[in-house]
Amino acid sequence: MAKPAQKLRRRERKNITSGIAHVSASFNNTKITITDVQGNAIAWSSAGAQGFKGSRKSTPYAAQVAAEDAGRKAQEHGMKTLEVMVKGPGSGRESALRALQSVGFQVTSIKDVTPIPHNGCRPRKRRRV
């Protein structure tokens, strides 16, 4: 028996003026999530979601494209000002921040929230190329 067709859920347009952009820049990918002040996700994007595959995901250009996409989605909900929280050692940190500013957001603060261990877990072995 066939399943009933799922209803298409439209994204309701929220009216939020300020929010937080969480930029997670790893060595392999860059993810950008834009949330309201409480932490509820409004828009997100990543380098992989923009069609970049493999080692191209880790480039600054891929991070820029992903940040512009997430920024445009957030602006549809009326967002104007952002706090930016950057996490991780990746190459897309600065380019994602610059892209968010170029989309037209007023960036009020920039925080680096990269987790630094106080000698916790043993790190992975060094790469020898």
UniProtKB/Swiss-Prot annotation:
Taxonomic superkingdom: Bacteria
PROSITE patterns documented for this protein: RIBOSOMAL_S11
Keyword field contains Hydrolase: no
GO molecular function: rRNA binding; structural constituent of ribosome
Entry's Gene Ontology BP terms: translation
InterPro entries: Ribosomal_uS11, Ribosomal_uS11_bac-type, Ribosomal_uS11_CS, Ribosomal_uS11_sf
Keywords: Ribonucleoprotein, Ribosomal protein, RNA-binding, rRNA-binding
Record bears the keyword Magnesium: no
Any one Gene Ontology cellular component term annotated for this protein: ribosome
Family classification: Belongs to the universal ribosomal protein uS11 family.
Known function: Located on the platform of the 30S subunit, it bridges several disparate RNA helices of the 16S rRNA. Forms part of the Shine-Dalgarno cleft in the 70S ribosome.
Entries under HAMAP family matching the protein: Ribosomal_uS11
Quaternary structure, from the entry: Part of the 30S ribosomal subunit. Interacts with proteins S7 and S18. Binds to IF-3.
Family matches, as PANTHER family: 40S RIBOSOMAL PROTEIN S14/30S RIBOSOMAL PROTEIN S11
Protein name: Small ribosomal subunit protein uS11
Organism of provenance: Rhodospirillum rubrum (strain ATCC 11170 / ATH 1.1.1 / DSM 467 / LMG 4362 / NCIMB 8255 / S1)
UniProt lineage: Bacteria, Pseudomonadati, Pseudomonadota, Alphaproteobacteria, Rhodospirillales
